[in-house]
């Protein structure tokens, strides 16, 4: 039996979900909630499940030598082409790639209908690059960040006012590599008490804060894909259309790829569609 919450407070001056879908529950085993800092017993069990997840090994790069492009100058992680680093086509010349490191926060909470939901943002329409696109809170690592979890939660606090003390960081997924060679670490965190989170979007970066059901990224509904080519290799880029209230959002590229993987790990099943064309060459390990 799941605990019932009050309706999620309106994401102040932003968009929040009102249409919730009944979803298949993740395959989790009931465990003690003593190690989880608040929330329902189901979220505590989910936290225990995700803490046991170990990402597969990925290619190793020397982080001391970094490649930077104009795309990463702003330090933000937004929707763009991206792959799990372990399947990116780098075997042709792996020594060439020295990516910068970044982290994004996949912040999960339990919706009013018991479904798992993830917090997303829409970038400000005033930004010069990728304006109006959907992204996960996140950005580049700073020298004082002790780990990827700190990077992700620090950026979330800066962008949407999410107090890090409300988030229980439970695991990190394997790195993703953006089109412009930014190594992105997805960090999964669980929002302990959604009623304590009152989003305060940074007006210089964020236009809206909203949430979506995590399971939608495993379904072949409101989704389309497009074949493209990168570095001589073909791949699929995914687009998810999502409507909440009177707002329509499109979640695509790197953000969609990360959420597909996060949903697969959380629900312990693959998506109901082909993720990408099986033509990638694996990097040397």
UniProtKB/Swiss-Prot annotation:
Recorded superkingdom: Eukaryota
Record flagged with keyword Endoplasmic reticulum: no
Main location: mitochondrion
Residues noted as binding Mg(2+) in the record, renumbered to the chain: 155, 159
Gene3D superfamilies reported for this sequence: Nucleoside Triphosphate Pyrophosphohydrolase
Cystine residue pairs: none
All residue ranges annotated as the Nudix hydrolase domain in the record: 99-255
Cited InterPro entries: CoAse (IPR045121), NUDIX_hydrolase-like_dom_sf (IPR015797), Nudix_hydrolase_AtNUDT22 (IPR030674), NUDIX_hydrolase_dom (IPR000086)
GO molecular function: coenzyme A diphosphatase activity; guanosine-3',5'-bis(diphosphate) 3'-diphosphatase activity; metal ion binding
This protein's GO CC annotations: mitochondrion
Record: transit peptide: 1-23
Motif Nudix box per record, residues: 140-161
Tissue expression: Expressed in roots, leaves, stems and inflorescences.
Role according to the record: Coenzyme A diphosphatase which mediates the cleavage of oxidized CoA. Can use malonyl-CoA, hexanoyl-CoA, lauroyl-CoA, myristoyl-CoA and palmitoyl-CoA as substrates, but not isobutyryl-CoA or propionyl-CoA.
Record's protein name: Nudix hydrolase 15, mitochondrial
